């Protein structure tokens, strides 16, 4: 998650282009949403079962990750997505399709 924050910061500051990152998890892990309370998670169970808990820079609820492909997407909003929501979805979907072909 720290890498996603670093990428987003670099994109925001103009040091990197829009970036789509695909990644997996080495072992089962829980990711908490940016504003979610840690008390929402059974931390004792996670510790007893060696399940790490990390915090995402994005919102939402806790997610148990295991044997999956995860992605993050960072882009500035200064023109790339200025033509409307539907066009933004098309551009992001095209990036996903290209990324999946390269995997």
Report each predicted region and the residues it spans.
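Active-site loop/lid in soluble adenylation, ligation, and acyl-transfer enzymes
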Residues: 1-48, 52-56
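Alpha-helical protein-protein interaction elements
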Residues: 14-15, 63, 81, 88
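A glycine-rich, hydrophobic loop/mini-helix early in the fold
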Residues: 40-80
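Contiguous, small/hydrophobic- and glycine-enriched helical/loop subdomains that border
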Residues: 68-103
